Structure formats: C-alpha cells, structure tokens
C-alpha cells in the first residue's frame, strides 16, 4: 500500500531506529533508501533491513524526488533518516487513506527525542506554526498519494526548503495534521542550541519567502 522513501547521507547513527519504526508494518510494502554518497555504514544498514537502495546527487530535494520515481505503491511516505514514527501510527494513517479525498496529504506530530523543557517548548511552537500558517517541518514526514504527488510535480531539485516548497503547492485546505508522533533526533538542537537553531530556521524561511536563492539559504543554514 505505501512506499516509504528515506533520503540519507552518513545517517548510520539514526537510520536503524527509523527503519525499525517501519519494518513489519502491514501498511509499508516497500522501503526505498535514497543515498547521497554516504561514507559510513548507512548503505549496509539499509540493505540489512531489506530496503531498496538507490542513489542520487546530494540534496534532500533531489534524493526525495529520485526515491519517488522508484516507488511501486499508490501511496508515498517521505521520512527523514533521523525521524521514527511512534508505535501504532498505522491506525491513524490508514484512517486518513480511507476517509480523506485522494487530493490530500498528511503530516505527523513533531516530537523530539529528549525530555528537556526547551524541547517541549519547541514542539509547541512547531504546532503553533502548523496551526497558524499550515507550514509543518519536514521532520513531520509526508504521507501523500502517488497520483496527487505527481499532479503537484513532486519534490523539486533544490538544495534546501524542499519541504516548504511542496507544502505550499499542496495548500492549507489539502493538508491534514495527524496526532501520531514523528519522533526526531534532537542532536542538532543540542549541538547548535534550542534558541539559535530555531532562529536560524526562521531566518531561512523568511529568506525563502522573500525570494532568496535556496543555494544561498543552504550556505547560511550550514
């Protein structure tokens, strides 16, 4: 029923948890790992889980698009390599597939994998952003029918902001926020700070809306 598509680049530290959250699910009939020239154990982990391994130029947009072209199922689940879906996510996802129009897409609930109070505060801000502006994080995954995805033109080969780009094309009225959690690694927030990293994300978003080149935004993001 669903092809799961995971873009990777040196993701050995988190990929196993992501694959475990999908492996054995009755809804997931295909897992595609699209790798951007990893030099660690990423490819071996993918193969050990029986995932279909394909390769693409580095860049999340390019890698997601390449994975989608390999998908054989009618539904696509795009998921970052540092994000795992909580147990039981299938029930809500199946309900979405069965009861919402085919021209709809769904995202999961942003959750970080640590108990620090700033992590909870950030989760609340992300939910508020989704409620007010219908702009979820890419970390929340994306469940969409292959037909609707193709009608939208799919992910574009841009180095950053590919998630915002496709969400804007989906549109607020076609987007469903599920309650099931997408549990994301908090490593980058621990490394860069729970204030600096979100502010940097916001700056990137504002630059994108003002028409700044995604290539420049990527340099700033780094």
Per-segment meaning from a language model:
Residues 5-24:
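Short, well-formed alpha-helical segments that are part of the catalytic scaffolds
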Residues 13-17, 40-49:
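Acidic helix N-cap motif at the loop->helix transition within catalytic regions
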